[in-house]
Amino acid sequence: MKSSVFILSLFLLLERQAAVVGQYGGTKGHFQSSSSGFMLGQKGHLNFGLKGGSEEAAEESIFMQSQHQMFGQDGGDMAQTSVSQEHTGVKGAAICRKGQVSQLKSQESQIKSFRQVKSSGQLKSGGSQLKSFGQVKSSESQLKSFGQVKASGSQLKSFGQVKASGSQLKSYGQMKSSGSQVKSFGQMKSSGSQVKSFGQMKASESQIKSFGQRKSQGGQLQSYGQMKSYGQTKSLESQAKSFGQVKSQSGQMKSSYGQRKSYGEETQLKSFDQDAQLKSYGQQKSQKQSSFSQVKSQSAQLKSFGQQKSLKGFSQQTQQKGFAMDEDLSQVRKQFDDDDLSVQQKSTQQMKTEEDLSQFGQQRQFGQERSQSYKGYLAQYRKKLQEQQQQKNFNQDNFFTKGGAGLYQAQLKG
């Protein structure tokens, strides 16, 4: 009887230990605790709640009552052995339970670190995505602005080319007008030099004529001097002859009174001849001078006529050249007016393009402000969406209510 009771109590004790081992993480796959309130499922998720503490206490009390009754019926010796065995089993169960609690705590810390790593990885990926999206947006805006700047640069280049062509046309017109002026000045200068050379030729001709006249006058004067010296020599000879005659006939003065009278008559006749010769020479001289003055006046008239003729021809040439210059100037003026009109049209077109560019810049600034406000709204929306996604990932198996999940998250963050 004692042996059967001992075997029965030993069997019950082994069954109790097996049940305790199954309860603390053996075959049933979950662990119950009245103090901690944690429960670890087979999937690896943490389940929280107050569960099973009173049931375990009731089972222990029922088992203890049955043991005490059995030990009371069978004998006092077996009661002491069963109580000691039960005490050792409870100690082992407590040790096993402590080990399971430590394992549970380590698993909970691992899960916390895994969740933190996962959330930080999601935050990093979301930040990198936002950064890449911002970079793409900035690159798009840069490309747009670069295209606009390139278009405005090409427009400015074309405007500069138009302006340069206008300035070149203006400078070409100025060069043409200056060239025509230089040509006309050169023609006038050449005509002036021709007139000067013609005047010099005329002056040289007049000088040659005056030199010839002077030479002829010198020859005439020389001949007049020769004639005068010949008359003087003649008179001297006659005087010498008369002196010799007077000297030879001085002794015969009284006897030759008639001879003296004849000598006086001869001298008077000689002096009269000399006076007549001098008068004829003065008449010849006056005639020559009058003819010289007539020739001089005729040459002066011819000279003035030639000058008038040359001046008339020169005036006709200058008139013809002036007409040609007026025609060239009218053509240049017409071309300059056309160029000025084209430059005015291009300047109005440029002002219009500048106004269009300013309006486009204002529209672009308004678009940039709108895009910045949209970026801020997009960042807020993404932040809110990320928070919602984190909450959803945390409570994806719906183990918690909405308030419980938020409370546990706040506790984890704290």
Swiss-Prot record:
Keywords: Copulatory plug, Pyrrolidone carboxylic acid, Repeat, Signal. Residues 240-259, 306-321, 342-351 have a biased composition (Polar residues). The modification Pyrrolidone carboxylic acid is found at Q23. Residues 170-228, 240-294, 306-369 are annotated as: Disordered. Residues 108-311 are annotated as: 13 X 13 AA tandem repeats. One of its GO terms (cellular component) is acrosomal vesicle. Coiled coil: none annotated. Sequence repeats lie at residues 108-120, 127-139, 140-152, 153-165, 166-178, 179-191, 192-204, 205-217, 224-236, 237-249, 257-269, 275-287, 299-311. Residues 277-294, 358-369 have a biased composition (Low complexity). Residues 1-22 form the signal peptide. GO terms for molecular function: zinc ion binding. This is Seminal vesicle secretory protein 2.
